[in-house]
Amino acid sequence: GHTLRLSTQIAKADCKSSGAFFMTEAGVAEELPTEPIGYLKVVTLGESTLSAEELTSIAGNLANGAVIDLGEATFATTEFPMDFTRKTNLQEIALPRNIQTFTPSTYNSGAFYGCENLTRVTFPEGLTAIGQNCFRNCAKLESIELPSSVRTLDIYAFYGCKLLTSVVIPEGVEAIPRFLFDSCTALTDVTLPSTLKSIGAEAFEATGLEEITIPESVTTIESSVFKNCKSLERIQFPDALTAIPANLCNACSALTTINMPSKLETVGNDAFYNCGKLQDVTFPETLKSLDERSFGGCSAFTRIIIDIPAIANYAFWNCANVTSIDLGEKVTSIGRNAFISASNLQTITCRAENAPSLGNSAFGSAGSKVEGAKILYVPAASYDTYETAWTDVTSQGYALQDINDQQLTDGIYYRA
């Protein structure tokens, strides 16, 4: 979109095999312009390089909406410095062709940290790492195309890039670090590589993701990765995943579908808290524990079948549309408010011969909206035990019945 008016000095440049040339809208020169730069293309020939001092001068002399093209220049080192930090006049930049990494940064700095009007960046093939805070709070950055050579991404690299819509992470990358795309609210599409092994905490928190497939190679996912992703509807977990961490999908209000990995052992606190559209899930036999509020507020659940020793406090709090709960033989304790506010709960099945201990209000307000019969199915030989230990349940109108006479949903009775 820029018109380059080449003066007679271009002939001089054409005859040289080395040197640095600065092309502006006014023509070609061998010295940097002194007036504020609206457009600048730097070309280096032979063994000549763009010096660190020259780059500093360019960064300090930008006009509003500046476009800087260094794609045909060789920089003095392979490490790009932090001269453009908070340069709000910068609109577009192409990095020098030999850049491999960025200068290490601190919490409040980065190569393009706070370049609020940067809309486009072009990376060279050969770039291997994108550093901490590199493009943090580049609120107008619309797209990035990471070279296939990239292997390392650092924390906060694209934090707060609010207009970024899609990203393809190159094959060879093994770790998504913490906060990488946190608060990229327009980010709807991410492709993860088959080489990926871990995803750091809050990496995609508050993004616009609509669905995500996590590669089978991933064995570690940290907390809050998809927290507050209000548009996220589907997640495909790797089947070998053994732990779903705390707050993973907390407040993902559009989430409807997840798969429970076949080797899953633990689900952390608040992992799916207030996922109000999440449909019924099937827990694998390998499951050992659910932490507090792990499925609290999953109001679209209609049925819960679970068989673990301890059901944590508030684990299924306010699952208001659940009509049946089936507790397996392993269950020994049910925590405080674990199933509180299950107001449409019609049947509870508990297969343990010894009545599990109940925390305060474990089934508080259960079945409060049920107009017909409410039944507590238990082993016939354990009636006395449940009558004594589960008075908080029977006092809410649940009648004890033999588990062997439990009625199927189609109205047919079966013998267990």
Protein language model regions, located:
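Consensus positions within tandem repeat domains that build extended binding/scaffold surfaces
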Residues: 109-113, 131-136, 154-159, 177-182, ...
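Extracytoplasmic cysteine-anchoring/structural motifs
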Residues: 1-13
